[in-house]
Regions:
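Short, small-residue-biased leader/transition segments that mark boundaries at the very start
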Residues: 2-6
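Short, structured beta-strand/loop micro-motifs enriched in basic residues and often containing a Trp
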Residues: 14-27, 44-45, 250
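Short histidine-centered loop motifs in beta-beta connectors
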Residues: 25-35
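Short coil-to-beta-strand transition motifs
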Residues: 50-58
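Buried, small/hydrophobic-residue-enriched core segments of structured protein domains
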Residues: 51, 65-432
């Protein structure tokens, strides 16, 4: 991703999207026409009402959009010309205890940005984590560089780390090529350096290598952007959800970074960056773990990049895979492109190139799943609904994103991330 900043005017309307917080069933606590400050709750977790979700801006609630079965899709707020923020009071993180930290995050509507293993869902304050994991290494294709976001936010990042260290031991994972002092010299945490290809940056992979999750145990996982949100809260007493989001992909004119708020409409900073308006796949996130979106979408609570790649629906390749192509990527060396080495770049599109089929090829997942689990057998156990087998094979340690690369190379074309998510949801209901 380029380093050029995409400077944009502030949008008129913002929206908080509940789907960005996995495992949360939202209960809206505002009505249309009501005025809110930034930091005021727009909705809460129905299962745990003390977990609030804060408005990114001050303004008037203009719409509560619902989908099928009245599912809340988003809460929209028209921003004031002069922004007002609820003041939660500055706090010295050095003297706070764990309960005070949790209460501060709950009051300000930021606690929901913390996820947990098992189940890979937004956590609740009654969980007792044995450790907290943060991965500053983003190594998915077209992912943003967290060091870009860290620039100018070093103090807030450290304050957030110190605050969480009062709750449990904090492990910070960094990449071998990351040299920001705020990462290398982070205080009150254990810094672990990771070297290797994607998915080395996945927080689940790091948990598996450092302190695996057994049945009955819980660890918290936090996106590094949220650590900055937490730190700003303690340093200023106010909710500030600004972040740098990468705008990348072969369909983007000038890849770079946009400084936006959570809830910013994509149309405000992506629309004039697209090379074309047709035959383009716009993704909220990276191509492997992101969600298909369009210009009506918004920056989610955990969004770190917006990517655009060719859809591929306008391609008509004569004789398909039979021709010995040199510009097509293949993990199984089906094309001669492997002769050009690993540094050759490819312009991949969104086509699946094949239909779903039985799992015949063995060992495919293990090559790209650097965890001490049998990925293939775990997937089979989830498909067959064998909960005992799933537990034995380590389902409590995984999240859907851990299978993203495996899904990409899978010759069976299975939606592995969806399979894992469905399995985790079923297990969560069984153990509730």
């Amino acid at each position: 991703v380029g380093s050029e900043m995409c400077i944009r005017d502030r949008a008129e309307e913002y929206a908080l999207v509940p789907d960005a917080f996995v495992g949360v069933t939202p209960k809206v606590v505002v009505k249309e026409g009501v005025h809110v400050n930034s930091g005021d709750a727009l909705f809460v977790n129905k299962a745990c009402p003390e977990v609030k979700f804060a408005s990114p801006v001050s303004g008037t609630v203009t719409a509560i959009e619902r989908g099928e079965r009245r599912k809340v899709l988003c809460v929209k707020v028209k921003a004031d010309a002069e922004q007002q923020a609820t003041d939660f009071g500055k706090k010295n993180v050095d003297v706070l205890d764990g309960e005070a930290v949790k209460n501060a995050l709950l009051e300000a509507g930021l606690f929901g940005y913390i996820n947990q293993l098992p189940y890979a869902v937004s956590t609740t304050p009654d969980t007792k984590p044995k450790a907290i994991f943060i991965s500053a290494l983003r190594d998915m294709p077209l992912a943003s560089d967290f060091e870009k976001e860290l620039e100018g936010n070093e103090d807030a990042f450290q304050a957030g780390l110190t605050a969480l260290s009062k709750v449990a031991k904090v492990y910070l994972g960094v990449g071998i090529d990351q040299h920001s002092r705020a990462l290398e010299e982070a205080k009150n945490v254990e810094v672990n350096v990771f070297d290797g290809p994607c998915p080395a940056g996945n927080v689940g992979v790091q948990v598996n290598h450092i302190d695996p999750v057994n049945k009955g145990e819980v660890v918290w996982t936090v996106d590094p952007s949220a650590i900055i949100f937490f730190g700003r809260l303690f340093l200023t007493g106010k909710v500030d959800l600004r972040k740098k989001v990468a705008v990348a992909g072969s369909e983007i004119k000038t890849p770079g970074y946009a400084e936006v708020l959570v809830g910013t409409p994509l149309s405000a900073f992506v629309a004039d960056q697209l090379k074309a308006t047709e035959h383009v796949r716009l993704i909220n996130g990276n191509p492997l773990t992101g969600v298909q979106t369009d210009m009506a979408g918004f920056v989610g609570g955990h969004t770190s990049e917006i990517t655009a790649i060719p859809e591929g629906d306008d391609k008509d390749e004569m004789l398909g895979w039979i021709l010995p192509r040199t510009s097509q990527f293949s993990t199984s060396r089906s094309y001669f492109s492997w002769l050009f080495g690993k540094k050759k770049e490819y312009d991949l599109d969104a086509r699946v190139k094949g239909g779903e089929r039985h799992m015949i090829m063995s060992g495919e997942y293990d090559k790209v799943l650097p965890m001490d689990i049998f990925g293939e057998y775990l997937i089979k156990a989830i498909i067959t609904g064998d909960i005992d087998k799933q537990e034995q094979l380590g389902i409590y340690e995984v999240s859907p994103e851990d299978f993203a690369v495996a899904e990409f190379v899978d010759s069976s074309k299975l939606e592995l991330q969806k399979i894992v998510r469905d399995g985790l949801n079923t297990l969560r209901k069984e153990n509730a």
